[in-house]
Amino acid sequence: MEPGPAHRRRRPAVACSECRRRKIRCDRGFPCGPCRKSLPALSCIYHSQPRAYAASAPPRPHTAQHQPRPKVNNTHSVDLTKFNLPSFESDAFHGLDQFGIDWQPSWEHQITPPTGHLADAGADYFQSPTFSVIDDHEKKESTNHSRARQGYPGSTETINPGSVSHSAGVNPDSGDDRWYQILARIGKVEYLIRDITRHQSSDEAQLVPILRDLYEAEPDECLRLPPLSGIVLKLENQARLQKQQDDKQSLARLSPLLDASSKIHQLLPPRQACKKLVSAYFETFGSVLCILDTAVFTSEFERFWEAIDASRVPSTDHEEAFAHKLLVVIALGSVTCPSSPGAASSEAERARQTSRRNHAIMCVQHTRQWLAQKTARGIRADLDVAQILCLLALARQTQLHTDPWPRRPSMDGTVILTGDHDLARLGMQMGLHREPRTGSMAKPAKEAETELRRRLWATMLELSLHQYLDAELPPPLGADSYDCATPSSNGVEEEPRSYFVPDSLRVPASTVLAALSRTQRLRLRVLEHLHASGASKDIQESQRLAIELSQAFNSEVNSLLSPASTQPTSFQLWLLNVFVRPFILALGVPLSGESRNRFADYYLRRLRLENAVAMLRPGPHEDGPRSIQSQISSHAGQTGSRTKTAATAYPFLPTPGTAEPCNTSSEQHFGTHKAACTSLYIGGPSYYAVVHRQVVASLCADVVAEIEDDMFPNLDAAMLHRIVAILEDAVNEYRDQVHASAGAHACHEFILFAAAHSLALASLNRSSAREVKESVMSSVWMALHHCCQAMGEPAEAMLETEWGTEAVQQTATESQSVNRSVSDADKGYEIDAQLQGVKYMLQQQSDAASTADGEIADMWAFDDDESYLSVGLPL
């Protein structure tokens, strides 16, 4: 019997099929670099790749999102040690290897590396998500998925943070790339988006050459980024690296306060600053969500500081719980406190703001560490623990938490973070979802406790609804599975006095929470319709729920804005819209597989436009003259003649020497609370910033489609002009953020939204195709010019050119200047001297804890020359 053919071992392919065909070097990535950079994008396939080798290759972005989530187990105990959580991502601690292990040896002072808890606290601050390239292949894939792939404000992100190294220049503060896909619905700016996202995975040393090759290879009708964009992205990467280094230094100096031997009062700011931060919390988050009883909190605050003055430490469980409530309240209050007017762009002020934010992260981490220790000993949830968990959930939405936002699905299991409990399920285990049975002879104290439980249940359910919407999970309870009454609109406790809004102009937080509570059952039905298995997902049911929820919510808003009643603040209206309208927008995304109906598409687009405008302009008092009266050319915004916006003109924190209360005019009240909103939704990776980016992108795409359809030109003319004006204000807010952060934040948003706004404005003015193209490219050029100025580099010195037919030729003649600006001295990305920030360093002391304690006092010391508003609580 003759032997068979010799066995030949299959070996992995050394190059993909496309690289073999093109006879070029393949980097064996998945996809490889040449296929990723090609235009149009090529299919990167390894034909001889065995299964084992294919499984070991890194996954493509967007792959993990479509995997099923682990089911949430039911719980029958309030013991937090056995309490299961909803699905959270397994990569929440991505980036720890670059945070607490390899410290830079070139630092000026020897700094003690942070502890593991500090690394947890900073993990979210140094996230390195990957922005995918929106090519034709991915667009075809996206049409085959369900509603979750379409995207809506508050939906889950589509990025894979482990696919690109941190040094690739990826934005660590964006948090999502869903807004890229939403904005890519505008066909004329799609290539601009592809260019700016393609840079995120490109070799840093080849940014400009790659872009020049792409620009020359495309037809003339394509709108492409100018070569200056490569330099801007390089400078942006340098600014972020400098910011990360400053964050590491600041967090390392504060890390000794997480030791078991440190006392909690060492983390607290001075008493005067602590009062202002507590006041800022109650004027913002506390004016919507009734987590704390304000009267009880005020009295306990006074007793707490008396104990500190007497050198007494918290001894009882209740005193410890209050101390950690205070830590998280201070952290939340610091987030809504912008800098002083005119100082936001200075390096010293940016260093102080960085230190304050890192201090807030440490306060939240200290509370999580305390809660973990209590949980290990078998703590049982009571009202104090429930309040702390609500505050931690709110801190997670503001990105003062290690849980990155939005959450990403994963089939590798879930990461359980201390304090990340399913609040709705916990509330049911505590019995908060049941209405207490009280008789007619109930005592006042019992009535107050009953009202507190109602408010706490409404707050816990409200915070949980957004977890379910973001994680695409069905709720653990139905719309009719709880009978807890709506919180009373009239406060039982006495509201704390505030100079922000006098009592005669104040809407109690209980009134706003009651309005939210009356829409919660409808939103539970929306979640069941969207994510429950076996639920009907036809477009008619989605439209019916959207109409019902819109009508119910509009009725609540109209009652709050009634001329006969007290008007809510702009922050209350903004947060109210952010909590409810993303559910309507989720219903406005068409399902895949549905037959396209032009009239249905038109209705859904109008629905998205209505809700996006309401979220960007929540109150009628915002319909007046805009804060920035600039046209498209003002996107560049000369820094010397910038008009002060509400985001910088009305900060919260006062000067201690100022004794008189502030002016109570409605304009000043609007500016004060508008500043708090802007500090939350502009820049950074918080939930509010993610929602805001997606809302602006949705508004850009829908208004351009509305202008192009031109179905009702006479009726819609005024409306479209108003929407374009709202977009202009949003672009200018991102422009101000670029200037305030020295280019570390919002560069991509500013460039792309400026291009979309210019396209909408030119199309609305009936410009020709050539004029539209020139307008868009002029706006992009001016936006890049402003980014260079914000980062301390004059654009004229790097690229002397105007947009026209000779742009590419002029770029080639000045390649020496471009290459000199782009090249790095070494692979460690040494920061140029002009981008060096003022290092906020204390002199080295022997006791690290006392050094950190002194730094906290310095960062919260207010100078007399800072024009802060006079704000105070009777604490």
Curated annotation (Swiss-Prot):
The keyword Metal-binding applies. InterPro entries: Fungal_TF_Env_Response, Transcription_factor_dom_fun, Zn2-C6_fun-type_DNA-bd_sf, Zn2Cys6_DnaBD. GO terms for molecular function: DNA-binding transcription activator activity, RNA polymerase II-specific; RNA polymerase II cis-regulatory region sequence-specific DNA binding; zinc ion binding. Pfam families: Fungal_trans, Zn_clus. SUPFAM superfamilies: Zn2/Cys6 DNA-binding domain. Transcription factor that positively regulates the expression of the genes that mediate the biosynthesis of tenellin-type 2-pyridones, iron-chelating compounds involved in iron stress tolerance, competition with the natural competitor fungus Metarhizium robertsii and insect hosts infection. PANTHER family: ASPYRIDONES CLUSTER REGULATOR APDR-RELATED, HEME-RESPONSIVE ZINC FINGER TRANSCRIPTION FACTOR HAP1. This is Transcription factor tenR. The lineage of its organism: Eukaryota, Fungi, Dikarya, Ascomycota, Pezizomycotina.
